[in-house]
Amino acid sequence: MKLKFSVIAVVLMTVYGVSKAQEDNVWKKLTGVTYEVGEDEYGELYLPVFSEDIQELEGTEVSAEGYIIPFEGMFKPEHIILSSLPLAECFFCGSGGPETVMEVMMADPIEYTSKRVKVKGTLKLNAKDPEKLMYILTDAELVL
């Protein structure tokens, strides 16, 4: 009986560990994007080409930790931009690439904070609409 309990405990801890590792590595997976040059009515643009690992995440619930980008006068508590990098290094302000940010559509409004936050929602990939970011999290909830 004791051995059976030990085996079950090890299996549960392993499953939790794998799940937690995948959750923590979502930003790492999202860096597996490449680009191809395309054109629209305004000229050349770079279109994302998502790796198989990224495509497998589409439509699944993922968690992402990061920093809310504070667009002055534009912060909407139900629609935020989340950066995997601190503000000084983010895509809009520093050296990060477009794969380091995602649009997050919150299920409930949140308050702005300069501290790191964690959100959970359904990942959508965007390769066609240049007015939106390529990663969009919908029905998101604040976890931390």
Task: Enumerate the predicted regions with their spans.
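Sec-dependent N-terminal signal peptides
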Residues: 5-15
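OB-fold and OB-like single-stranded nucleic-acid-recognition modules
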Residues: 20-144
